[in-house]
């Protein structure tokens, strides 16, 4: 073979190298994505299978599993990192207003609520819009006769009403507003009543054990008419005889169970069958450093670049009323395990979320969501 032919063959070979390199990189990218998706999906499926054997962990009260969703009436109380100081001010609350209720006729009074649980205690931050606050006057009657708040729980299939009333702003404790339930002390419900520019605020703490996993509340506005013309705002009312709406909060048994499955760099979440967050566990990532990651820099840059070209969805944060949104969650609650990529807040990083349905009694009773970012997976490869 003469020199000219040899040069032609070498030139052709060199021309194929970029194409071969691109093919190699593409196959590597596909393998990385498939590997991460399979690993995260397997984790979600394993947790879902474990929880399927313990439906009581998701639903301590099985009756809630059989009832329809009530996003307007039910109260959602997420887990709090620390208990708030009961002083009637909202600066101790990280969450925004989770829901509000108002009088149908005049829109006043209006009741806004925040709720959270910590250490077996339910905390409430209630803000009432009232054009004219009327305080209880002990000289008129021992029974509350001014503006007040009613709490309604449900124990042993019977309701228990409590009233919060005061002659002046300051510390408050509940009183019975209906026949007393045996073994329940109204004084366990305590808090602080504070005047506000719009009306008043009441910050309360009460044991979860006395709620029966249901809670109704409504503000009573007497508006200067102590014997007539009352207006109310809340998720229940004085004439309601049925059980109050559900109080939805993370069951401690479920939180403990979920923490056992958390792997470094993964966030685990469990929702009920309506998509409301019931438990969450996050294990700190290991093996990651921003400046001196051991992962081969070219592989890291490649994975970021290829994901950036294909991932366009932003991850929605949990709503104040507890609902989680996402393509994979919708599919899991419909009975199908799915993975989906999202953009991350961190530059160049992306988030993989895999969801699997939790099945029980022949139906989907919830979903398990496992999240892991792309950088954490690369550190493990």
Report the location of each language-model feature:
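Structural preference for beta-rich elements and adjacent junctions enriched in aromatics
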Residues: 51, 58-322
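Membrane-interface helix-start motif
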Residues: 6-7, 372-381
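Soluble sensory domains of the PAS superfamily and closely related sensory modules
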Residues: 320-339
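A short, hydrophobic, proline-anchored segment that marks a local hinge/packing element in signaling
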Residues: 205-207, 344, 353-362
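Juxtamembrane membrane-water interface segments immediately C-terminal to a transmembrane helix
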Residues: 26-48, 71
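A short beta-strand signature within small-molecule sensing/ligand-binding domains used
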Residues: 110, 187-189, 337-339, 347-357
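Extreme N-terminal signal-anchor transmembrane helix of membrane signaling/transducer proteins, especially
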Residues: 1-26
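Sensory beta-strand/linker motifs that couple input domains to effectors
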Residues: 366-370
């Amino acid at each position: 073979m003469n020199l000219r032919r040899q040069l032609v063959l070498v030139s052709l070979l060199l021309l194929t190298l970029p194409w071969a390199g691109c093919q190699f990189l593409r196959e590597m990218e596909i393998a990385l994505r498939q590997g991460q998706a399979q690993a995260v999906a397997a984790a979600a499926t394993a947790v879902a299978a474990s929880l399927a054997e313990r439906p009581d962990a998701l639903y301590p009260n099985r009756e809630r599993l059989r009832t329809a969703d009530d996003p307007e009436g039910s109260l959602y109380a997420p887990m709090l990192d620390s208990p708030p100081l009961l002083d009637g001010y909202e600066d101790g609350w990280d969450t925004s207003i989770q829901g509000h209720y108002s009088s149908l006729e005049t829109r006043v009074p209006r009741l806004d609520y925040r709720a959270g649980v910590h250490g077996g205690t339910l905390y409430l931050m209630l803000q009432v819009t009232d054009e004219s606050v009327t305080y209880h006057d002990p000289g008129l009657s021992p029974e509350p006769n001014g503006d007040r708040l009613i709490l309604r729980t449900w124990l042993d299939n019977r309701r228990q009403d409590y009233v919060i009333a005061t002659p002046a702003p300051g510390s408050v404790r509940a009183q019975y507003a209906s026949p007393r339930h045996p073994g329940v002390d109204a004084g366990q419900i305590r808090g602080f009543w504070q005047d506000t520019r719009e009306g008043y605020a009441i910050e309360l703490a009460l044991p979860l054990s006395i709620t029966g996993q249901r809670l109704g509340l409504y503000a009573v506005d007497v508006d200067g008419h102590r014997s007539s013309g009352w207006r109310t705002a809340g998720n229940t009312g004085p004439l309601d005889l049925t059980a109050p709406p559900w109080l939805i909060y993370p069951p401690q048994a479920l939180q403990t169970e979920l923490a056992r499955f958390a792997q470094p760099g993964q966030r685990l979440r469990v929702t009920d069958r309506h998509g409301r967050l019931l438990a969450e566990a996050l294990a700190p990532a290991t093996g990651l450093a921003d400046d001196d990651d051991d992962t081969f820099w070219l592989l890291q840059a490649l994975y970021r670049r290829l994901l950036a070209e294909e991932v366009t969805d932003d991850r929605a944060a949990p709503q104040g009323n507890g609902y989680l949104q996402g393509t994979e969650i919708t599919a899991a609650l419909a009975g199908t395990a799915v993975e989906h990529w999202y953009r991350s807040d961190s530059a160049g990083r992306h988030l993989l979320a895999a969801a699997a349905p939790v099945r029980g009694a022949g139906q989907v009773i919830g979903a398990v969501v496992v999240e892991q970012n792309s950088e954490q997976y690369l550190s493990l490869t």
